[in-house]
Amino acid sequence: MKKVMTATEIMEMIPNRYPICYIDYVDEIIPNEKIIATKNVTINEEFFQGHFPGNPTMPGVLIIEALAQVGSILILKMDQFEGETAYIGGINKAKFRQKVVPGDVLKLHFEIVKLRDFVGIGKATAYVEDKKVCECELTFIVGR
């Protein structure tokens, strides 16, 4: 599949940088509706040093952070939010269904459910090999 956005283009849109930029590329964008992106999880991730020795597992909160970053890209692609920053305003209904480990390819899906002025809600889901590993509802706030 052809990349819609590269890591360099992603870093031009969102402020996250190493070691907390969790998107390798964007696979698909339907403007104002949904986005799918990829994170290749490798043993070289800093968080694996302590989470957990001998049983490396990606922390659930970092999966949610990756989903929020993907949502930020979709939101900031909207004309009215160009040049702004999207922040997490809330996390609801978070569920973790299986662990994410080195070698996994994390597919990150975000769909806008509701948007009013500078506040919105998105449905966020992460998959590994078509298996749902995490889902949540993210409230976002756009500002400077």
Curated annotation (Swiss-Prot):
Listed EC numbers: 4.2.1.59
Annotated catalytic residues: H51
InterPro entries documented for this protein: FabA_FabZ, FabZ, HotDog_dom_sf
Keywords: Cytoplasm, Lipid A biosynthesis, Lipid biosynthesis, Lipid metabolism, Lyase
Subcellular location: Cytoplasm
GO terms under biological process: fatty acid biosynthetic process; lipid A biosynthetic process
Membrane-crossing residue ranges in chain numbering: none
First and last residue of the signal peptide: none
GO MF annotations, alphabetized: (3R)-hydroxyacyl-[acyl-carrier-protein] dehydratase activity
SUPFAM superfamilies attached to this UniProt entry: Thioesterase/thiol ester dehydrase-isomerase
Catalytic activity line of the entry: a (3R)-hydroxyacyl-[ACP] = a (2E)-enoyl-[ACP] + H2O
Domain of life: Bacteria
Annotated family: Belongs to the thioester dehydratase family. FabZ subfamily.
Protein name: 3-hydroxyacyl-[acyl-carrier-protein] dehydratase FabZ
